[in-house]
Amino acid sequence: MKAWGGPDRPADDRERTLREIEAAGIDLDPTGSHDAGDRDHDHGTGPHQHPHHQSRPGEPPVIGIVGAGAVGTALGVALDRAGWPIHAVASRDPGRRDRFRSLVPAVRAFADAVPLVEEVELIILAVPDDAIPRVAGELHMYGGQAMVHTSGLLGADALSGAMAAGTQAGSFHPLVAFADLERAVAAFHGATIAIEGDDQLLDLLARMAEVLGATPVRLAPGSKPAYHAAAVLAAGGFDALLDAIAELGRLAGLDEAGSLAVYAPLIEQTLGNARALGIDRALTGPATRGDRGTIRAHLAELEARAPDVAALYARLADREIGIAERRGSLTPEAASDLRSAADPALARPD
């Protein structure tokens, strides 16, 4: 089984990630084909010929990025620092163009993506998911070019509007949180990147991930919505959970920084336990003990002082009870009894 990883990545971290990915049944060997289509934009007149800026054998492709938001800028900066220069960027926002140019000084900047296509070999669409089909449909690729998007939800078929004979389409989705530029650039090293495309393009995208120090994986066909929903829970969903923790921390006299300082070690320990022992064995708390009174007391307090958090607590408690039942800590009867205790309506004071 073939796998890729960045040459500068610590061996133990890389091997651990690869073992976990392989154990999860994810195919690390991109040997399947993806038919991106061969329709020509001139309706059967044959493939366009790419006019400018072709890379030499062994060199990185000539890259252009459409979109200079958080993802496009961080990816462009990371690739440029890793020795894969960005030739051009396109953004309708002049402030974003100027910022990208300040970070990647040699880049050519365009307000429109159409002239960018004339100058590059690999086009990266780093635009919002809803805009990808429309933007792709406005761009006419040339034979020998490839286009990828950075969406975690959409497949390569979202780029069908840009396809012509002799072109390729794919996707390149980094599992990175793009809240801060420098932190995101650093986070590529050690991240996982989901790639999609035919064999030749997959090889290129795997090398592109490798230079960033990331591990590329190819997902099962049709699995991207579930994969991306999990990513949203791991990032935005987890941040929402931290917000709920901080809200309860305020009731205990802690500010946000104080709550993070108090609960971060427990969060990190739980993640470490899950990685070492598995999710089921990592579960702790009243659900594992069948502690009905504690759950009722928590919900009564939250209903009175933080009702929004009470609803979240109840939903998570139901999930915890399911884990406890699955691992054998609770009988089906005990789990059913505990679920009734986790109903916020039953915990409200009369």
Which sequence ranges carry the predicted segments?
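NAD(P)-dependent dehydrogenase/reductase Rossmann-like domain
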Residues: 324-325, 329-350
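Interdomain hinge/lid region at the active-site interface
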Residues: 272-334
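Phosphate-coordination loops involved in phosphoryl transfer and adenosine-cofactor binding
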Residues: 59-62, 144, 190
